C-alpha cells in the first residue's frame, strides 16, 4: 500500500495541474474532511475501501456500480469522480432528489442483509483507521435527512394554514387570536418582540380600531400564530432578524422559519421617498383637510400615482403610493406643524408673552416606526433635527420677537409725548 502512495500522489498532483472544477458541495465536503484531522493518505485509503465494498455489494446483489472506477491507482480521474459521488450522495440525503446518472450510484433501499454487511464494513473501516467512526457518521447523516424532510413538510403545512387564514373573515380570526392569547397568557409585548410589529399596532388591530394590517404583516402575524399553536412556547424565544433597507424582497412572501436558527425572519418595509410631484399634490390636499378619511386617502393616492405614472410603464410596489403611505405622510405633517408651534410658544413664553398653548398632539398623529414601515424621507428627518440648526432657528425667532417688542415700546413713548 505504501509503495502505491507516490503514484497516487502524482496522480493527485496531475489533477491540480488540470485545474478541476469542484462544486460548492464538493469543496464543503473536502473542508469538513480536512477539519476532522484526516490526512490525504487516510482519505485516499478510505475511498479505496469504499470502492472495494461497493464492488462487493454489486457482485453480491447483481447490481452494477458506477462509482467512478475500481482502483485509485489505475484511474486518472479518480479524485474528481469520488468527490462527485460523495456530493451526489450528500445531495440525495438532504434534498431527497435522485443524483445525476453521471456521478451516482444506486440509492434504492437494500435488502436486510445489507445492514449486516454495513456493520461488517464499519468494523473493517474502524480497524483500518482509528480516526474514523463510520457508524456515528452514518447515524448523523440519517438524522439530518429525516430532519430536513420534517422541516420542509412542517413549513409547507404552516404556509397552507396561513393562506387559509388569509382567505377567512378577519374579524373571526381576531377573536380566535384574542382568545388564544388569553388562554396561553401571552402578552402582546411578547408577540410584538417576536413578529417585529409594534404592540400598539397589534392592540389596535385586535380591537378592530384604526386601519387594517398590511398583507405582509398579517401573514407574519398568522405565521407566528400557527407556529405557536403547533409548538407552544417555541417562538417566544425568537427575535426578528434585521433586514437591510435596500432589500427589495420585502414585498414578496416571507421566508421560511427555521426552528433551529433562533430567529423569526420577517420582511420589513423599505423607506419610501416622496417625489416632488406627489408632494405638491399632498400639500394641496393637506391645506383642504388635515384629517382625511380612508376614502379620501385612496383618492389622494390615486392622484399621486396618476401624476408619476409614465405612459406604457407600470409602477412598481416601491414606487406606488398607497393609502397607508398617505396616512403616514399626513400624520408626520401634522406632527411637524405642532412641533414648530410648540417651539414658538416656548420662546414667546420665555420672554413673558402670554400665548395660547397649541396643546399636545393627539395619539392619532403618533406614527410608530414599527407600525408603518414606509416612512417619509421629506418629513421624518425633522424628528431628528440637528441641535445646531434648531438653535439657529430659535435664535431667528427670538430676534424677530425682540424687534417687535422694541418697536412696540417706541410707539408707546411717541404717543405719550403727543399727549403732553
Curated annotation (Swiss-Prot):
Compositional bias annotation for Polar residues: 94-132
One cellular-component annotation, GO: chromatin
Domain POU-specific atypical residue range list: 145-241
InterPro entries given in the database record: Cro/C1-type_HTH, HD, HMBOX1, HNF-1_N, HNF-1_POU, HNF_P1, Homeodomain-like_sf, Lambda_DNA-bd_dom_sf
Domain annotation HNF-p1: ranges: 18-49
Bias (Low complexity) ranges: 64-73, 81-93
Compartments (UniProt record): Nucleus; Cytoplasm; Chromosome, Telomere; Nucleus, Cajal body
Position of the Glycyl lysine isopeptide (Lys-Gly) (interchain with G-Cter in SUMO1) cross-link: 413
Effect on the protein upon substituting residue 335 to A: Abolishes binding to telomeric 5'-TTAGGG-3' motif. Confers binding to the non-telomeric 5'-GTGAGT-3' motif
GO molecular function: double-stranded telomeric DNA binding; identical protein binding; protein-containing complex binding; sequence-specific DNA binding; sequence-specific double-stranded DNA binding; telomeric DNA binding
Keywords from the named record: Chromosome, Cytoplasm, DNA-binding, Homeobox, Isopeptide bond, Nucleus, Phosphoprotein, Telomere, Transcription, Transcription regulation, Ubl conjugation
Function noted in UniProt: Binds directly to 5'-TTAGGG-3' repeats in telomeric DNA. Associates with the telomerase complex at sites of active telomere processing and positively regulates telomere elongation. Important for TERT binding to chromatin, indicating a role in recruitment of the telomerase complex to telomeres. Also plays a role in the alternative lengthening of telomeres (ALT) pathway in telomerase-negative cells where it promotes formation and/or maintenance of ALT-associated promyelocytic leukemia bodies (APBs).
Subunit organization: Associates with the telomerase holoenzyme complex. Interacts with DKC1, XRCC6 and COIL.
Domain notes: The homeobox domain is required for binding to 5'-TTAGGG-3' repeats in telomeres, and for telomere localization.
Protein name per Swiss-Prot or TrEMBL: Homeobox-containing protein 1
Gene: HMBOX1
Amino acid at each position: 500500500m505504501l509503495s502505491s502512495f507516490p503514484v497516487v500522489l502524482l496522480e493527485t498532483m496531475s489533477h491540480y495541474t488540470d485545474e478541476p472544477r469542484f462544486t460548492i458541495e464538493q469543496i464543503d465536503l473536502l473542508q469538513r474532511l480536512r477539519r476532522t484531522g484526516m490526512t490525504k493518505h487516510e482519505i485516499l485509503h478510505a475511498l479505496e475501501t469504499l470502492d472495494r465494498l461497493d464492488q462487493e455489494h454489486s457482485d453480491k446483489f447483481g447490481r452494477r456500480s458506477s462509482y467512478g472506477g475500481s482502483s485509485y491507482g489505475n484511474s486518472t480521474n479518480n479524485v474528481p469522480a469520488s468527490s462527485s459521488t460523495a456530493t451526489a450522495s450528500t445531495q440525495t440525503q438532504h434534498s431527497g432528489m435522485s443524483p445525476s446518472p453521471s456521478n451516482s450510484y444506486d440509492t434504492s433501499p437494500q435488502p436486510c442483509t445489507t445492514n449486516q454487511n454495513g456493520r461488517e464494513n464499519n468494523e473493517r473501516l474502524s480497524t483500518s483507521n482509528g480516526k474514523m467512526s463510520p457508524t456515528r457518521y452514518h447515524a448523523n447523516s440519517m438524522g439530518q435527512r429525516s430532519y430536513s424532510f420534517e422541516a420542509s413538510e412542517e413549513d409547507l403545512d404552516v404556509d397552507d394554514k396561513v393562506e387559509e387564514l388569509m382567505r377567512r373573515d378577519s374579524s373571526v380570526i381576531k377573536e380566535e387570536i384574542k382568545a388564544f392569547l388569553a388562554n396561553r397568557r401571552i402578552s402582546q409585548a411578547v408577540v410584538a418582540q417576536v413578529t417585529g410589529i409594534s404592540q400598539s399596532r397589534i392592540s389596535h388591530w385586535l380591537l378592530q380600531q384604526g386601519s387594517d394590517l398590511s398583507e405582509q404583516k398579517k401573514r407574519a402575524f398568522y405565521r407566528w400564530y400557527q407556529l405557536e399553536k403547533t409548538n407552544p412556547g417555541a417562538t417566544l424565544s425568537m427575535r426578528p432578524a434585521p433586514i437591510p433597507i435596500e432589500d427589495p424582497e420585502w414585498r414578496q412572501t416571507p421566508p421560511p422559519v427555521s426552528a433551529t436558527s433562533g430567529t423569526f425572519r420577517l420582511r420589513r418595509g423599505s423607506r419610501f421617498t416622496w417625489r416632488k410631484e406627489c408632494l405638491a399634490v399632498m400639500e394641496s390636499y393637506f391645506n383642504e383637510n388635515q384629517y382625511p378619511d380612508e376614502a379620501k386617502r385612496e383618492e389622494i393616492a390615486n392622484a399621486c400615482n396618476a401624476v408619476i405614472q409614465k405612459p406604457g410603464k407600470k409602477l412598481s410596489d416601491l414606487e406606488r403610493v398607497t393609502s397607508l403611505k398617505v396616512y403616514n405622510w399626513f400624520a408626520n405633517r401634522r406632527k411637524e406643524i405642532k412641533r414648530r408651534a410648540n417651539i414658538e410658544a416656548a420662546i414667546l413664553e420665555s420672554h413673558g408673552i402670554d400665548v395660547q398653548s397649541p396643546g399636545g398632539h393627539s395619539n392619532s398623529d403618533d406614527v410608530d416606526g414599527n407600525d408603518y414601515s414606509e416612512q417619509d424621507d421629506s418629513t421624518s428627518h425633522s424628528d431628528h433635527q440637528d441641535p445646531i440648526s434648531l438653535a439657529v432657528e430659535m435664535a431667528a425667532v427670538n430676534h424677530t420677537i425682540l424687534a417687535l417688542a422694541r418697536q412696540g415700546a417706541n410707539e408707546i413713548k411717541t404717543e405719550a409725548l403727543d399727549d403732553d
